[in-house]
Amino acid sequence: MLSPKRTKFRKQHRGRMKGIASKGNTIAFGQFALQAQDCGWVTARQIEASRRAMTRYVKRGGKIWIRIFPDKPVTMRPAETRMGSGKGNPEFWVAVVKPGRILFEMGGEEITEEIAKEAMRLAQYKLPVKTKFISSDINLSSDSSGEGKTGKDSKEEVKK
């Protein structure tokens, strides 16, 4: 599971999740992505479960990029202990997710939109935040109206 190798401080405050994601909110690596619609904490276990679900469905077809990393420690006190006597020990790691954040990306030559959509659907069942499937609008086909010719070339053809 994902966790930082080392941190400056062992424990953190819980914090607040205000506003929308300012970083990591555009597709950078693949053609298809899973984008968060609301805020929440995504644990390292949930990220791993989502990754496994997508990998199993896609098999060896394409590549999956994980765009979030659990870098926030969540502390817990042992059961049936009295109040006070300090903060609990770190139990697990979470990634703070805000609306608009890209969680996973997928791409590759064998990956169609249907395959990516189904794989992302399986992954979104494992996550505690509401998400939506998005795709980048990169169209690699040539322009059908001019077949890639400039205006000058097409004018010359008309004269002949």
Swiss-Prot record:
Which GO molecular function terms does the record list? rRNA binding; structural constituent of ribosome; tRNA binding
Q: Which PROSITE patterns match?
A: RIBOSOMAL_L16_1, RIBOSOMAL_L16_2
- What Gene Ontology terms for biological process does this UniProt record contain? translation
**Disulfide bond recorded as keyword:** no
The UniProt regions of compositional bias labelled Basic and acidic residues, in chain numbering, are: 149-160
Extract the CDD domains matched here.
Ribosomal_L16_L10e
Listed GO cellular component terms? ribonucleoprotein complex; ribosome
- InterPro entries annotated for this entry? Ribosomal_uL16 (IPR047873), Ribosomal_uL16_bact-type (IPR000114), Ribosomal_uL16_CS (IPR020798), Ribosomal_uL16_dom (IPR016180), Ribosomal_uL16_sf (IPR036920)
- Location of the region described as Disordered in the Swiss-Prot/TrEMBL record: 138-160
Keywords for the protein's UniProt record, in alphabetical order: Ribonucleoprotein, Ribosomal protein, RNA-binding, rRNA-binding, tRNA-binding
Tell me how this protein assembles. Part of the 50S ribosomal subunit.
Similarity comment text for this entry: Belongs to the universal ribosomal protein uL16 family.
Give a short account of what the protein does: Binds 23S rRNA and is also seen to make contacts with the A and possibly P site tRNAs.
Classification via PANTHER family: 50S/60S RIBOSOMAL PROTEIN L16, LARGE RIBOSOMAL SUBUNIT PROTEIN UL16M
Provide the protein name: Large ribosomal subunit protein uL16
